[in-house]
């Protein structure tokens, strides 16, 4: 029993050692000597979404709509919205995961300091990862928030 407790304490210490706060939008893993890509936060609060909807500029394509507004931080905040019109919970969650993964893998191309909301349209329901990724990159280019 005592051995399990010590193991749990060691794991907690290791986790605390691995994750450090982001500096200038970067996230570090110190134990492996690797630098992970930029660190983004999520938009979760209703009033944060409302600020972006009211003050932000929007562009859309066949599959996605993107609202963007500058924030006063050194990292991006991403919010994803998938309406019930798109499909049942399995479909909505799949689209959310595709959008989040597309953003995560292309995150280094996006400029820092923006609140971004991505809304999935009904046409995105049956699309592949590559279609969603290209739609997201296209909208980033329209907003001029992607490095060339």
Q: Where are the predicted features?
A:
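Positively charged, solvent-exposed patches that mediate nucleic-acid binding
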Residues: 1-148
């Amino acid at each position: 029993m005592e051995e399990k407790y010590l193991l749990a304490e060691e794991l907690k210490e290791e986790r605390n050692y691995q994750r450090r706060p982001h500096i200038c939008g970067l996230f570090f893993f110190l134990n492996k000597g690797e630098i992970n890509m930029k660190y983004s936060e999520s938009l979760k609060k209703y009033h944060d979404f409302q600020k972006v909807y009211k003050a932000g500029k929007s562009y859309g394509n066949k599959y996605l709509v993107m609202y963007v507004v500058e924030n006063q931080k050194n990292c991006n905040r991403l919010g994803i919205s998938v309406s019930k019109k798109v499909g049942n919970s399995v479909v909505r969650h799949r689209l959310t995961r595709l959008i989040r993964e597309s953003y995560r893998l292309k995150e280094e191309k996006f400029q820092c300091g923006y609140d971004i909301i991505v809304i999935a349209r009904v046409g995105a329901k049956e699309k592949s990862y590559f279609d969603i990724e290209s739609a997201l990159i296209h909208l980033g280019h329209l907003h001029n928030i992607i490095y060339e």
